[in-house]
Amino acid sequence: MRPALSDYRHLASGKVRELYRIDDEHLLFVATDRISAYDHILSSEIPDKGRILTAMSVFFFDLIDAPNHLAGPPDDPRIPEEVLGRALVVRQLEMLPVECVARGYLTGSGLIDYRKTGTLCGLTLPPGLTEASKFAEPLYTPASKAELGLHDENIDFAATVDLVGEKRAAQLRERTLQIYTQGADHALTKGIIIADTKFEFGVDQSGELVLADEVFTPDSSRYWYADAYREGQVQPSYDKQFVRNWLTGPESGWDRAADQPPPPLPAEIVDATRSRYIEAYERISGLSFAEWIGASA
């Protein structure tokens, strides 16, 4: 008989995830249908989003050649029925205070920093780059982890050394670029460009660096259509940039600079976001989301 969610002690809430304790060594990592943008948790939810994120992470954890935090399969008997398909049993780790970002293309906050200073996280970039320019080699551009509701700040490698030490900082850079390259190469064979992504790492009791949290999901990555890619313009995408674009567009009526929460998402934006996330999973994995475990919304 599967345990009930109430059998486990709730430890923490994030923008999208809930964390519960199973025992001294294992946690229950639950992905909800919440969606966040611009450091706000939106009032609207995306049906099945938590299941899609979990399915995508499981696919990439299996694909990537790096130790990860999984401690059981997606149908592990320790997972309660009510969160089956959106929860994973994971190892407890000492999480490192760095958002490990890999960028293959210039966009988002990276483009903003480049236009101001010609640099990105302490790296001097060549002149003449524009929206969606591809880098000669992927860049490691770390960020500090902010508290819930605050904004992660891009930092340089020296600041990472201050946070975790020189040896661990070098290991984070190497592992981040290795994982990004492997995942992005796979995605490209499926017609998808992963423009950038972020990883989180922890350390286990033996001191081994372990990939944790989520990996290559549409929440943590920018997914572009490879056949529609054009340098110099904003790219159509599978990820939550679609939601960000609506929020900052005239249709939403939201003033991002004002101290007001974002408005609810219209039904068509919710439905289109769900469809994009499912399409990303199915194209990347070659699997049908309809066959993923757990109850559909």
UniProtKB/Swiss-Prot annotation:
GO terms for cellular component: cytoplasm. One of its GO terms (molecular function) is phosphoribosylaminoimidazolesuccinocarboxamide synthase activity. Its EC number is 6.3.2.6. PROSITE patterns: SAICAR_SYNTHETASE_1 (PS01057), SAICAR_SYNTHETASE_2 (PS01058). InterPro entries: SAICAR_synt/ADE2_N, SAICAR_synth, SAICAR_synthetase_CS. Belongs to the SAICAR synthetase family. One of its GO terms (biological process) is 'de novo' IMP biosynthetic process. The keyword Acyltransferase does not apply. It catalyses: 5-amino-1-(5-phospho-D-ribosyl)imidazole-4-carboxylate + L-aspartate + ATP = (2S)-2-[5-amino-1-(5-phospho-beta-D-ribosyl)imidazole-4-carboxamido]succinate + ADP + phosphate + 2 H(+). Gene3D superfamilies: ATP-grasp fold, B domain, Phosphorylase Kinase, domain 1. Pathway: Purine metabolism; IMP biosynthesis via de novo pathway; 5-amino-1-(5-phospho-D-ribosyl)imidazole-4-carboxamide from 5-amino-1-(5-phospho-D-ribosyl)imidazole-4-carboxylate: step 1/2. Keywords: ATP-binding, Ligase, Nucleotide-binding, Purine biosynthesis. HAMAP family: SAICAR_synth (MF_00137). This is Phosphoribosylaminoimidazole-succinocarboxamide synthase. PANTHER family: PHOSPHORIBOSYLAMINOIMIDAZOLE-SUCCINOCARBOXAMIDE SYNTHASE. It comes from the Bacteria.
